[in-house]
């Protein structure tokens, strides 16, 4: 399994996985603008998953924006490998904390992040019936 930063030519595959994974997919133009923050995982020559993250708060905190794995490659540790690789990169950059926002109805994502060591630090009430959970992990 190879993990590397995305390139322009990878965006079509990212969009394909995006559309298979989320009811409201981000479009090509937006993904192109943030492509430096996309990490891909390959199985041979095939892109089978991605993680999008960004840094904020004077580059001491990072945020996971999205993680998605192609349906044919799910439950194989790909998302876990992407998060572990991101943590290595962030540690090298002296980033001390990473957070993620997860909707309360997405129990698999909540369990995934808890297994990775994230802790729920707050609940963000929404006008809809679904609340958001802010989860954080201290790095290093």
What are the functions of these language-model segments?
Residues 39, 96, 103-110, 115-116, ...:
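C-terminal "cap" of GNAT-fold acetyltransferases
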Residues 1-9, 137-140:
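Conserved N-terminal entry element of GNAT/NAT acetyltransferase domains
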Residues 67-84, 93, 103-111, 115-116:
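Conserved glycine-rich acetyl-CoA-binding loop
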Residues 61, 97-99:
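Structural preference for beta-strand elements that scaffold enzyme active sites
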Residues 8-72, 83-85, 89:
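Acetyl-CoA-dependent GNAT
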Residues 3-4, 117-121:
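Short secondary-structure junctions
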């Amino acid at each position: 399994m190879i993990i590397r930063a995305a390139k322009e030519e990878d965006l079509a595959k990212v969009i394909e996985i995006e559309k298979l994974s989320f009811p409201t997919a981000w479009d090509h133009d937006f993904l192109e603008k943030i492509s430096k923050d996309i990490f891909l995982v390959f199985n041979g020559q095939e892109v089978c998953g991605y993680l999008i993250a960004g840094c904020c708060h004077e580059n001491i905190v990072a945020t996971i924006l999205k993680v998605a794995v192609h349906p044919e490659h799910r439950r194989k540790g790909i998302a876990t490998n992407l998060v572990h690789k991101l943590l290595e990169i962030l540690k090298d950059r002296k980033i001390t904390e990473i957070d993620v926002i997860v909707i309360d109805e997405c129990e698999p994502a909540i369990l995934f992040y808890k297994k990775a060591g994230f802790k729920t630090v707050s609940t963000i009430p929404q006008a809809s019936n679904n609340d958001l959970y802010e989860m954080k992990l201290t790095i290093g």
